[in-house]
Amino acid sequence: KGPSTIGKGNHFFQFASIGEDCQDKKYKGEATELIVGDYNVFREGCSVHRGTIQDQGKTIIGSHNLFMNTTHIAHDCVIGDHTIFASGAQAAGHVHIGDWAILGGMTGVHQFVHIGAHAFCGGGSIVLKDVPPYLMVHGAPCVPAGINTEGLKRRGYDSEALLEIRRAYKEVYRKGQTVAEALAALEEKAAQVPELKLFTDFIANASRGIVR
């Protein structure tokens, strides 16, 4: 259904519902949109809804994503590239998911939450606050479980970048500081290391607060 813009090479399996009206009770039939990039896989029973005029009016999905069976992408979500939604993972309205993020099976993401690039949410996680890039989280509600080191290695992160990311994680999560204090301590190094700046910028702009 639409209006929907679908890129090339996408694969839709049986019973997937793509571009349907959203389930937001404020929706009154406005001509909102779904935009899908290239080479995504939507497995059986996956549902993706269009946006609402209360937000940007569109749901946006990038390229090379895998949405396993019975996953759900609600209205106004913005999904990056190369993400994986394992079976039953659900993103509520207005959620943003960064590139290469992975949601384990039956993960539930609260409205307006942002999940950073390369983050990993363990199966059954309930995500109520923003998840910074590179983090692993698990539980209901979810808590931090370290850095997604193996995923970063597979994507070409070198030992120096990994070391700086680990140090930043300790600064935010292990020293008993406030978020503001941790960001101040990381400011100088973040200006020199792009991978670290992605981490600190995300935290500084987290409107819901971060998982801690």
Regions found by a protein language model. Name each.
Residues 1-143:
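Structural signal for interior beta-strand "rungs" in well-ordered beta-sheet cores
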